[in-house]
Amino acid sequence: HHEVLAKGFSAIRKMTDKKLSEILNAEENSATYNAIRKEFPSDDIKTTARRFFIFGILSDIFAKTTGFCGGVAGSMHIFFPPFGIFPSNAIVGASASIAAGAALFKKLQKKKGVVIANLGDGAAGRGPVFEAMNFASMKQFDSFWEEGYNGGLPLLFNFSNNYYGMNADTENETMSFSGDVARFGSFEEKGMKAEKVDGWNIPSLADA
């Protein structure tokens, strides 16, 4: 859940104290917030928000009602829209389609930022991922859309490769597995920017 934690902490760091207070005091977050205030009191709103975020995630993993999803999300489907974390689902790779829709919304609303679809190597051979990439690469974004709305979607597909898709060996089951970067880069006529990065090399990740 490193991507979820990173996104949540980034959102907390960037938000104003007023906005964080509104989120923490929202009725739908009362169970999580009340538990944090009781067990881990703090006068610093950002410290409280970080504790609230971690507690909400762990509560869902351990099936507690104080979780963001009432304890039903488990370890696979945690989400918290106020911090920009959209839901996953039970279909491998289908979060790519959700991300493409969220990116289209951002584009139409002229909102700043980029949508990131965090996917595993098992998703590299799934239809929903290819459909999302095809949608994100449509030529009409440049040729048909009016000024101010033209250009590609603010969308990044982030694949984490651990060499397993569920319980399968992705290297021997996925088409051109070793050439995924070149394959994904060929979606757009001019080439969708694609790059392979060593996940253990922090400077390379930051540069990418």
Locate the predicted segments by residue.
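Short, surface-exposed acidic/glycine-rich loop or hinge patches that mediate macromolecular interfaces
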Residues: 123, 199-202
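Short internal beta-strands
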Residues: 156-160
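Structural signature of the thiamine diphosphate
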Residues: 202-208
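Glycine-rich beta-alpha junction loops
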Residues: 161-164, 201
